[in-house]
Amino acid sequence: MLQRIKNLRKPKVETLNTINISRENIINNIKLIKSLKPDSWIFPVLKSNAYGHGILQILDILKEEKFPYIVVDSFPEYQIIHNNSNFKILIMWETLPENYRYFDYSRTSVAIYNLSTLNYLISLNKRIKIQLFLNTWMNREGIQEKDLERFLTLLKNNPKISLDWVMSHLYDADVEENHINLQIANFKKMYSIIEEYWFKPRWRHIGASAGICSIDDTFFNAWRPWLILYWYSPFSEEKELLKKLKPALSLTSSVISLQKLSPQDWVSYNHRWIADKDCWSATIPFWYYEWWLRNLAWKLTYYYHWKQLEQIWTICMNLSCCIADSNMKIWDKIELIGNDINKKNSIAIIAEQANTIPYEILIRLDRGIRRIVY
């Protein structure tokens, strides 16, 4: 309550750049995900600042729904969720041992794949819920089959540590010729060893966004949607199942300068762009500090209302330019990223122009840009 009063007293400072998050579209995506797995539990993934959408903003939307757990990957993200909601939290990746002293284990379950971490948790002498992260041949992290019984023996001898989950991660579920069935077979083989020790974990999960669309196996009773929560498909080709997803993020900037140009006038560094007719250029305060990669120069399309604007000249650290519309005024808004998949400033198109993937575009959006849920 005190914090709310303090916030009311703060001056409302408007920002030049704003990321807008559609509550309606996120809710739409949640409903679609639940419809794909109606008999399973859904654990939304908010790691990497909710893929650039903002943890607090997405958290505010998710409060309208019921989920057993919210998934994050780090201690700092755990703190944000814990301090701003009543959700239970699943930590997907390990942290430094000394940090485990600070978790609220009444609301937290942690992933384990190192014996040293498990031994440290045992030394805390607390009741702690854990999940065993199995290595089903991705070989990035996880418990190998040859080591599994050492973990199980420790758990059997230390009943304060409760095995509630078993999980793994798919390494090529987003391609047509994949090894999903091989990984599932490995998972089930290791799970049978867990059962031999008389453990009955509540949840079994191996699939994230691609797995939700690719696996139809009732053995798994939980799923971890990440990209598709925000609309972005993990597949290179569009899946019929995902056509009803809606992008939730758009980004606008503000015109801070308008310059009238004559033929042969140039713009910014090194005379890289020269006008071939009378025109105006508009400058906006957004470039590679805020995220845009330098290799996107000359490739982007901005929108002023529904009119396309060509981005021009080599970029600066905090500024970029485009051809201005004749009706444009100082402080007018320009849309840099749109949430319409058919427009040239969609995340998918920008990622293609940058020769990267949509995730990288999203997670690199500067955390300092104000994010607003509408």
Where are these regions (language model features)?
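Active-site anion/phosphate-binding pocket segments in diverse small-molecule metabolic enzymes
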Residues: 2-23, 27, 76, 95-97, ...
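Active-site-proximal beta-alpha core segment in soluble small-molecule metabolic enzymes
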Residues: 4, 13, 17-21, 25-27, ...
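Glycine-rich phosphate/diphosphate-binding loops that line cofactor/substrate pockets in enzymes
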Residues: 30-40
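Short secondary-structure boundary/capping segments within folded domains
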Residues: 34-36, 51, 275
